[in-house]
Amino acid sequence: LYDRQKTGKGMYIDVSMLDCQIAILENAIARYLSKNEIPKPMGSRHPSIAPFEAFKTKDSYIIIAAGNDKLFEKLCNVLKISEVNQNPKFSNNSSRAKNMDELKKILEDKLSTKITDEWVKEMEKDKIPCGPIFNIKEAVENPQIESRNMIVKAFHKVVGDFKLAGNPIKMSTYKDEKTRGDIPDL
């Protein structure tokens, strides 16, 4: 838009899903390009920040992103395991990252005592970044998904009415309709 205002010409914007996926691999790409190290699969775990991954609770899973020492201290206080923060194996991020398997067991032992929603509420009070991991039903029915218009209605002459994922790109002057036009035959 700035370029159009400056030059009077518009432009084509190309955003590919592949490019977006590669962009999110910034840490792995940096490690490969700087150290020629090919990262191994780690699940949801961050390679150098701990704890920063999914943990099992009593009923499901929670993502916790205690990305610095202050957040880890708050997390230990919420979980009522402040002594863990005093242990040299876990007292700073570098030590926690080296001992993450042991730390994960300690955290999951405590997290298994309550359901995810209870932990999320407690952690959010202390501004600890966290959130539930939704199954597809929970994700689709989440009020935030509805408010972002990410499930929309469409029509196809053979299939009839159906729903599909909405457009993740939101633009202030483009009306993001809750209903898409008729789907063409291919």
Placement of each model-derived feature along the sequence:
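Active-site-adjacent "lid/gating" segments in soluble enzymes
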Residues: 1-62, 66
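Short, surface-exposed loop/helix-turn segments at secondary-structure junctions
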Residues: 32-39, 142-156
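Aromatic-enriched alpha-helical interface/lid elements that frame and gate functional surfaces
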Residues: 50-126, 130, 183-184
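Short acidic-hydrophobic surface loop/beta-edge motif
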Residues: 53-57, 152-157
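Short, glycine-/Ser/Thr-/acidic-enriched flexible segments
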Residues: 69-70, 138, 169, 176
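Conserved PLP cofactor-binding pocket of PLP-dependent enzymes
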Residues: 124-145
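Flexible, small-/acidic-enriched active-site or ligand-binding loops
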Residues: 155-186
